[in-house]
Amino acid sequence: MTFYLNCPYLCCVNDKQTKEDSVMLDTKIQKELTNDEYRAIQGWSSTQIKSVVKHSVRKALIPIADSDALRMGRAFHTVMESVEAFDRDYAVFDDTEIVFSIQRERPNISVPSMTKEYKQARKQFEQENQGKEIVSLDDFNTLLMMRENAFSNPQVEAIMQSADKTYVEQSYRKSVHIDSHQASVLVKARPDLIVHMGNSSYKMIDWKSCRDASPKGFRSDFFKYRYDVQAVVYCDVVGIDPRDFLFVALEKEAPYLCAVYGMTDEVIEVASRDYENALVSIARYENEMDEGGLTKDIVWI
């Protein structure tokens, strides 16, 4: 069973619907891109488009500052790609021995990581692993638990067993024509996973780390962060039916539970309308018809 997100309630339906089997992947960028290379290429990302939906074009143009949460998010998506990819890009700092040594010699130390010895050990480890991101052993164990629970979920397991080909972290780009303004907006997408099923249909899977993967908890995140808009952007750029887009919600805290969610037609319709309106705003901004800010009119709340 797969949960389908609706407003204002959740329904649970059998995942055996008649859907379009044909799909075009003509927008795929053939060159393999790293995350940094993808961010550098031209095109409006789903993150920026969501920002336009929630606020304005000018808000979407402000670069997002890096943070611990974003770094952990990148590590999460890398380990979901593959353990080999994680080993390539990350090094795990196991501080068990240095912490034990510090506490044995100075039992009154409450925060060993603030000591000179700890910082020296950390610095040496970073020097030995230049070019890699560093994650703690605790974070690494959490990531492995999340990955294990994702791929042992019966829905995910069934999809992967039916797959005859997978596209992992591939980059796509599409020029979307805006009829009302005789203009085009370049949009890009980098889905976590696209699975080609044996029956010639596709599933697009998006890994979502969260604190609460229950229907009530995930629904809150879903609409707060406009995951629906992200989904329709990805599906439009790649050429996949949004009903074949699945969110795999993974708790990043114990008990690390996992649930799979899809979107109802009503949710897709609202998200598609918001996406189209955002593209119009972007087109107006790019053609200097609008400064990309908030409305100058009075808005009655």
Predicted regions and their residues:
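Polybasic (Lys/Arg-rich)
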Residues: 270-301
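Charged/polar, low-hydrophobicity segments characteristic of intrinsically disordered regions
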Residues: 108-115, 264-277
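Mg2+/Mn2+-dependent nuclease catalytic core
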Residues: 168-273
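Metal-dependent nuclease catalytic cores that hydrolyze phosphodiester bonds in DNA/RNA
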Residues: 5-8, 12-189, 296-299
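Generic detector of well-ordered secondary structure
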Residues: 78, 235-236, 277
